[in-house]
Each structure stands twice: as C-alpha cells, then as structure tokens.
Amino acid sequence: MVLGQPINIIKWIEENGDLLKPPVNNFCLHRGGFTIMIVGGPNERSDYHINQTPEYFYQFKGTMCLKVVDDGEFKDIFINEGDSFLLPPNVPHNPCRYENTIGIVVEQDRPAGVNDKVRWYCQKCQTVIHEVEFYLTDLGTQIKEAIVKFDADLDARTCKNCGTVNSSRRD
C-alpha cells in the first residue's frame, strides 16, 4: 500500500479556495472508506440531503447553520468556528454556509444498496414538493446535478398543496 502525504488545510485553502463553487461549494479532499470534504461559503442550496449514514461537521472558519427536520419540526443548529457536530443518519438537513466560512465534512462511503435522497420542501407551507433518490458514489458531483435538474424543472418546483413556485436557491 502506498500512503498519501498529510495535507496542510490552511495552505490548501489559500491555494485552492477558488475550487469551492456554488451551489454546493465542496471539494473532496480524501476518498476511500470515507469522503472528507472542504466546504466553503456562501452556498446556494435549498435542498435537504438525507443520508443513511452519519455525517461529521467541523467548522474551521466562521459560523454555519445546519437546517434540519427533527421529528417533523424544522430547526436550526448553529455550528460555530471550532465546533464539531455529528449528525445522526436519516436526518433531512440543509447546510447553510455564509460568505468567508469554511468547514470540513466527513461522510462514510455508502454501503451497497443504501441510497441517499435529496428533498425539497415548499418554502411557504413546508410540504415535500420534490425528492430524488440515488446511490451516491461521488459527493463532488451527484448532489450538484440533482440541484441543477430541480432548478430547471418548473413543475418540480411548484407546490401541489399551495401553488408556490419555489426556488432551488436559498433566499
């Protein structure tokens, strides 16, 4: 086995910060059993990701807001600079990152047959308006692809309950 070299996170961010682009703003730094991502802000997401494995958040710079749906109730969890947070499996969550913020997120590779979901709730009445399910193999591209498709689909963005046309971008 050939081992990789340690990565100096501060230096990496200085040299590669331009790689953190909307709508997700992530870059997969390490892969293999786990994916370790550097995630910058601001991001432009209104989706809620549902992962059947836990997710670990470490806030390297600034504060982020992790919007979650906990037992049917919408809540905000603020993760401040220097804080870490372990999100349990199957919690719908929307990571809201602000300008000049940087976090590190660790996700377990998905076991065979275990799918992720990306879900959108109506921004007015909170009804589920759209959901896609897929086997996640690439955190760097697949969630972004789902967001781009949702953004282009007026029918998917229109709430059948109240008629609101929702944005794929966070207001």
Swiss-Prot record:
Pathway: Cofactor biosynthesis; NAD(+) biosynthesis; quinolinate from L-kynurenine: step 3/3. SUPFAM superfamilies: RmlC-like cupins. The keyword Nucleotide-binding does not apply. Substrate binds at E55, R97, E107. Its EC number is 1.13.11.6. It is an enzyme of class 1 (oxidoreductase). It holds the Pfam family 3-HAO. Catalyzes the oxidative ring opening of 3-hydroxyanthranilate to 2-amino-3-carboxymuconate semialdehyde, which spontaneously cyclizes to quinolinate. This is 3-hydroxyanthranilate 3,4-dioxygenase. The lineage of its organism: Eukaryota, Fungi, Dikarya, Ascomycota, Saccharomycotina. The gene is BNA1.
